[in-house]
Amino acid sequence: MKKLSVIFLSVSMLSGIAFADKDKVVATYKGGEVKESQIMKEFKPQLNLQSGETIKNFDDFPPQDQEKLIKIYVNNLLLKEEVAKSNITSSKEFQEKLENAKNQLAQQELLANYIKSNITDKMFDDEYNKYVGNLKGKEQIKVAHILVKSQKEANNIKTKLSKGGNFTKLAEESSLDKASASNGGVIGYILLNQPGQLVPEFEKKAFALKVNEVSTPVKTDFGWHIIKVLEKKPVPIPTKEEAKVTIDNILAAEVLKKYISDLEAKADLKIMLPKAGSKAGS
């Protein structure tokens, strides 16, 4: 029994040593050193949330990202030391800002907890079914465009295209929409009448085009567009998992709107401003 205890103790010690060896020092600075575990503890939750992937080890990051994370971590430590040396946190102005920040953070936490506790599985399922129902039978199109300032410029580009000009090349050379210009003018897939996508004038013209057809110049608040439809296909129906973020956001907005409305009603809120269109004192 005594031998077993010794063996167990030895194995435990060796395991501890092996684990310690894995926690490599990745940087040193005056006053300390930085280990992999410190970087992971600081950044892992946030990075997993942003990337949507599970990052387990420091070595999972590319070398350039490892260096960035180390520098961010050390810079935070150095700035923390500088703050400690100063008397900035004792000033009245800082305390007021701190109190405001605490209040905002507390409100955000309150709302997040309220939303989480007031969205049921049934609500999610109902909203998902509604969302999917709206997508069934709909078509999505892949569009590209060239954006210019004037109708004259748009007409010139349309003429060049009619004479065999290359849409991709002209978009790269002429489009004011630099984000899509770098990709040959390609915006991506859009659905008709989806809030937050594109302006109505653009959508109306785009959905009237056939595949590979190029539009006449279209005016919007952004300028003049030449639109090309690259592809048309049915909208894919997402699974619950694929639609989770979208459905959660829809439900959160609905729950939050009702919560704020109820608070205003309980507070008997009355806005004393004159109605729109009426003159003060009339």
Curated annotation (Swiss-Prot):
GO terms for CC? cell outer membrane
- PpiC domain location, by residue? 138-231
**PROSITE patterns found in the cross-reference section:** PPIC_PPIASE_2 (PS50198)
Q: Does the keyword Membrane apply?
A: yes
User: Where does the signal peptide begin and end?
Assistant: 1-20
Any idea where this protein resides? Answer: Cell outer membrane
Keywords of this protein's UniProt record, alphabetized? Cell outer membrane, Isomerase, Membrane, Rotamase, Signal
Catalysed reactions listed for this entry = [protein]-peptidylproline (omega=180) = [protein]-peptidylproline (omega=0)
EC? Answer: 5.2.1.8
The primary site where this protein sits is: membrane
Q: Name one GO molecular function term.
A: peptidyl-prolyl cis-trans isomerase activity
> Which spans are transmembrane here?
none
Which Pfam families does the entry link to?
A: Rotamase_3
Which leading EC class covers this enzyme?
isomerase
Query: PANTHER family, alphabetically?
Result: PEPTIDYL-PROLYL CIS-TRANS ISOMERASE HP_0175-RELATED, PEPTIDYLPROLYL ISOMERASE
Q: Per the similarity annotation, which family is this?
A: Belongs to the PpiC/parvulin rotamase family.
Task: From the Swiss-Prot or TrEMBL record, give the protein name.
Answer: Parvulin-like PPIase
